[in-house]
């Protein structure tokens, strides 16, 4: 009767008390994109809706300024 235990997801930005997400913080943004360059949805990461919108906007700005790639390395 062993049941699978799923760990509860939590929003990292809410826990830290972040007011906004900066597009220049590439290390944080890289945690929320896949290897192919797609933005990871909030149902996977557990990010709150408010911060998911800010995260999406920050990733798109960083892509536009060539701080992040639009796609993978095309190997």
UniProtKB/Swiss-Prot annotation:
**What biological process terms from GO does the record include?**
translation
Matching InterPro entries: Ribosomal_bS18 (IPR001648), Ribosomal_bS18_CS (IPR018275), Ribosomal_bS18_sf (IPR036870)
| One Pfam family in the UniProt entry | Ribosomal_S18
Gene3D superfamilies associated with the record: Ribosomal protein S18 (4.10.640.10)
| Gene Ontology cellular component terms for the protein in this record | cytosolic small ribosomal subunit
> What are the alphabetically sorted keywords of the record?
Ribonucleoprotein, Ribosomal protein, RNA-binding, rRNA-binding
rRNA-binding keyword on record:
yes
Keyword set includes Cell cycle: no
Which GO molecular function annotations are given, in alphabetical order? small ribosomal subunit rRNA binding; structural constituent of ribosome
What does the UniProt record say this protein does? Binds as a heterodimer with protein bS6 to the central domain of the 16S rRNA, where it helps stabilize the platform of the 30S subunit.
Provide the assembly information: Part of the 30S ribosomal subunit. Forms a tight heterodimer with protein bS6.
| Family as reported in the entry's similarity comment | Belongs to the bacterial ribosomal protein bS18 family.
Instruction: Name the chain's protein.
Output: Small ribosomal subunit protein bS18
């Amino acid at each position: 009767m062993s049941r699978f235990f799923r760990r509860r997801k939590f929003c990292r930005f809410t826990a830290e008390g972040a007011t906004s997400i900066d597009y220049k913080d590439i290390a944080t943004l890289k945690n929320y994109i896949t290897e192919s360059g797609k933005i990871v949805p909030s149902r996977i990461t557990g990010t709150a809706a408010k911060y998911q919108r800010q995260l999406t906007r920050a990733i798109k700005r960083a892509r536009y300024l060539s701080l992040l790639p639009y796609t993978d390395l095309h190997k």
